[in-house]
From Swiss-Prot:
Top-level taxon: Bacteria
Residues annotated as binding NAD(+): 10-34
Residues at the active site: 156
Annotated GO MF terms: 2,3-dihydroxy-2,3-dihydro-phenylpropionate dehydrogenase activity
Function, in words: Converts 3-phenylpropionate-dihydrodiol (PP-dihydrodiol) and cinnamic acid-dihydrodiol (CI-dihydrodiol) into 3-(2,3-dihydroxylphenyl)propanoic acid (DHPP) and 2,3-dihydroxicinnamic acid (DHCI), respectively.
Reactions mediated catalytically: 3-(cis-5,6-dihydroxycyclohexa-1,3-dien-1-yl)propanoate + NAD(+) = 3-(2,3-dihydroxyphenyl)propanoate + NADH + H(+); (2E)-3-(cis-5,6-dihydroxycyclohexa-1,3-dien-1-yl)prop-2-enoate + NAD(+) = (2E)-3-(2,3-dihydroxyphenyl)prop-2-enoate + NADH + H(+)
EC nos: 1.3.1.87
UniProt similarity note: Belongs to the short-chain dehydrogenases/reductases (SDR) family.
Descriptive protein name: 3-phenylpropionate-dihydrodiol/cinnamic acid-dihydrodiol dehydrogenase
Length: 270
């Protein structure tokens, strides 16, 4: 039996991409899974596909009332909350400082930070009482842009650096009751969109990046799928496998940190 059997897991943005892969993985692990998802169509799809195994709540991560409504439903259903995974986010399609008009930069900043930073903070606030009571955990999705430049423009990169500070502060404030950690995946096949303020709300990340371009920059030389990143979340959510980690950010970058100066990887001819 999995360590996560009957654990109550709350994931934001569970309708597609990494969020959907996390829903699939935690259900596979035997957990009671809930998600807060903005898209009504994706909520309907989740309910149709997973039935009683999913509690899918339509709502916006920038709205505290939506979070509280979801948490209330989770507690009614499961009687507890063991892990909150803040995952919903948006990207800026590498919109640069120089080429973005000032007024667009300002509105884009507020929209992107509302989702990527405030959304995490509001989720933590809504989930904290139940997680403190059950001595559970929080996990937040970061990005390779939390460590390196070039994984997005200044708006996205700054938002992911802000999220690392949020993780550290929450880990400090909530210790010893709640473990707080992060996972930073590299580029993957997903439906990640951009801010409406930048005209990117209907543009997927895969319209800006090709599988070949992503694989070429990674020392492990493959095009990651969302399911490739679910393992660290499972480990961090498990009380048995993670008793000692808090304030830790796992850089799941397919080797980006060890790229060579002359070559992406030295073993390409092995």
């Amino acid at each position: 039996m999995s360590d996560l059997h009957n654990e109550s897991i709350f994931i934001t943005g569970g309708g597609s991409g990494l969020g959907l892969a996390l829903v699939e993985r935690f259900i596979e692990e035997g957990a009671q899974v809930a998600t807060l998802e903005l898209s009504a169509a994706k909520v309907a799809s989740l309910r149709q596909r997973f039935g009683e195994h999913i509690l899918a709540v339509e709502g916006n991560v920038t709205c505290y009332a939506d979070y509280q409504r979801a948490v209330d439903q989770i507690l009614t259903r499961s009687g507890k909350l063991d892990c909150f995974i803040g995952n919903a986010g948006i990207w800026d399609h590498n919109a640069s400082l120089v080429n973005t008009p000032a007024e667009t930069l300002e509105t884009g900043f507020h929209e992107l930070f509302n989702v990527n930073v405030l959304g995490y903070l509001l989720g933590a606030k809504a989930c904290a009482p139940a997680l403190i009571a059950g001595e559970g955990s929080m996990i937040f999705t970061l990005s390779n842009a939390a460590w390196y430049p070039g994984g997005g423009g200044p708006l996205y990169t700054a938002s992911k650096h802000a999220a690392t500070g949020l993780i550290r502060q929450l880990a400090y404030e909530l210790a010893p009751k709640v473990r707080v950690n992060g996972v930073g995946p590299c580029g993957m096949a997903s439906d990640l969109r951009g801010p409406q303020a930048l005209g990117q709300s209907e543009t997927s990340i895969m319209q800006s990046l090709t599988p070949e371009k992503i694989a070429a920059i990674l020392p492990l030389q493959f095009f990651p799928q969302p399911a490739d990143f679910t393992g660290p979340y499972v480990m961090l959510a498990s009380r048995r496998n993670n008793r000692a980690l808090s304030g830790v950010m796992i850089n799941a970058d397919a080797g980006l940190a060890i790229r060579g100066i002359r070559h992406v990887a030295a073993g390409l001819d092995l």
